UniProtKB/Swiss-Prot annotation:
One of its GO terms (molecular function) is 5S rRNA binding. It comes from Actinobacillus pleuropneumoniae serotype 5b (strain L20). CDD domains: Ribosomal_L25_TL5_CTC. SUPFAM superfamilies: Ribosomal protein L25-like. One of its GO terms (biological process) is translation. The keyword S-adenosyl-L-methionine does not apply. This is Large ribosomal subunit protein bL25. HAMAP family: Ribosomal_bL25 (MF_01336). Belongs to the bacterial ribosomal protein bL25 family.
Length: 95
């Protein structure tokens, strides 16, 4: 099973900006590692939440398309809301 997500580069940083994203059905994330600089991104919450229900999401290499460029990543960390079935933030590491 392969996973491919479309992402936008995230320009607004901070707690307020993150809360606005989550309120609009999006989830903030970051891609880091490798020889490139870290990139803050925005993903669609429902697509990622549905994908993370599969065990393969945590073990396989994922593809994230950011500004027309494909990044090969693995999930490094996921932060979840303590009481709601919501994702709060994701960390991806380049492969």
């Amino acid at each position: 099973m392969s996973f491919k997500f479309e992402a936008e580069v995230r320009s607004a940083q901070g707690k307020g900006a993150s809360r606005r994203l989550r309120h609009n059905g999006q989830v903030p994330a970051i891609i880091y590692g490798g020889n490139a600089e870290p990139v803050s991104i925005i993903l669609d919450h429902d697509k990622v939440n549905n994908a993370q229900a599969h065990d393969a999401f945590y073990n396989e290499v994922l593809t994230i398309v950011v500004a027309g460029k494909e990044e090969q990543v693995k999930v490094q960390a996921i932060q979840r809301h303590p009481t709601k079935p919501k994702l709060v933030h994701l960390d991806f590491k380049r492969v």
